[in-house]
Amino acid sequence: MAHTVKIYDNCIGCTQCVRACPLDVLEMVPWDGCKAGQMASAPRTEDCVGCKRCETACPTDFLSIRVYLGGETTRSMGLAY
């Protein structure tokens, strides 16, 4: 089952989430918004099994990456008012 993976702009480009993902759902892409010059991207969300290892690996105080499981609403994702 595919899950929604949202990557926020406070990503520091550390690659921890990419290395933690057992299914290679994530990859790094160029981005000028941080010192590392890259940020995580989730091009293969159809392979996401919702293990949330990427969330656990994220070192930022406010998670840069979130996995929203199938039953979670768009309101919990911050996509609705």
UniProtKB/Swiss-Prot annotation:
User: Could you say which cofactors this protein requires?
Assistant: [4Fe-4S] cluster
Q: Which domain of life is it from?
A: Eukaryota
Instruction: Give binding positions for [4Fe-4S] cluster 2.
Output: 21, 48, 51, 54
Q: Which reaction does it catalyse?
A: reduced [plastocyanin] + hnu + oxidized [2Fe-2S]-[ferredoxin] = oxidized [plastocyanin] + reduced [2Fe-2S]-[ferredoxin]
Q: Does the keyword Electron transport apply?
A: yes
Give an example GO biological process.
photosynthetic electron transport in photosystem I
Q: Which SUPFAM superfamilies match?
A: 4Fe-4S ferredoxins
- The 4Fe-4S ferredoxin-type domain, residue ranges: 2-31, 39-68
Bilayer topology term: Peripheral membrane protein
The cellular component terms of Gene Ontology attached to this UniProt record, alphabetical and capped at eight, are: chloroplast thylakoid membrane; photosystem I
Query: What is this enzyme's EC?
Result: 1.97.1.12
Instruction: Name any one Pfam family assigned in the record.
Output: Fer4_7
Q: How does this polypeptide assemble, per the annotation?
A: The eukaryotic PSI reaction center is composed of at least 11 subunits.
**Protein name (record):** Photosystem I iron-sulfur center
Q: In which organism is this protein found? A: Cyanidioschyzon merolae (strain NIES-3377 / 10D)
Q: Give the organism's phylogenetic lineage.
A: Eukaryota, Rhodophyta, Bangiophyceae, Cyanidiales, Cyanidiaceae
